[in-house]
């Protein structure tokens, strides 16, 4: 926020800058793409997951790091390459099981980004203990109810909320 002082009336006026809005929209697009991929994997829809992942890969390349907060920028520098690689892997695969494997790494990096960025609504970090040969896997959701993207209808409600990010 920028504080502007008016010499006319002596009152301070607080005016939000466009940079804050641009920053939010950059990351909002990436989060929206992520949630769309998750929803497609819940439905075991490899085609829609691939399409949404392609959109996400484009949005990742378009991020202007100079408009991110310091914390977001630091996290972005660590996760951007893997985010792009995971999104590309999902977009190029027609096999939902391979997409789910790539989604696991995508989710780890999106978690780091979610922790660093300010979300307009709570985001739930959820966990499935069964995926990855019993090693487990996490994902982000806008809903607290479990809808497992790693198994879809086979084990739709397998998992739990491990953290709420506000």
Set out the residue ranges of the language-model regions.
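Mature extracytoplasmic or organellar-lumen-exposed domains after removal of signal/transit peptides
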Residues: 19-166
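Bacterial Sec-dependent N-terminal signal peptides
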Residues: 1-16
């Amino acid at each position: 926020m920028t504080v502007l002082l008016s010499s006319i009336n002596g009152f301070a006026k607080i005016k939000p800058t466009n940079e804050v809005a641009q920053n939010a929209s950059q990351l909002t697009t990436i989060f929206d793409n992520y949630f769309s991929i998750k929803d497609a994997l819940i439905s075991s829809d490899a085609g829609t997951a691939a399409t949404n992942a392609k959109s996400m890969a484009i949005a990742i390349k378009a991020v202007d790091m100079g408009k991110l907060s310091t914390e977001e920028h630091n996290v972005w520098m660590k996760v951007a390459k893997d985010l792009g690689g995971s999104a590309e892997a999902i977009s190029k695969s027609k096999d939902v099981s391979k997409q789910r494997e790539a989604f696991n790494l995508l989710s780890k990096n999106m978690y780091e980004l979610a922790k660093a960025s300010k979300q307009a609504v709570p985001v739930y970090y959820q966990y499935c203990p069964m995926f990855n040969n019993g090693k487990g896997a996490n994902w982000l959701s806008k809903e607290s109810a479990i809808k497992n993207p790693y198994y879809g209808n086979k084990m739709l409600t397998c998992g739990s909320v491990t953290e709420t990010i506000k």
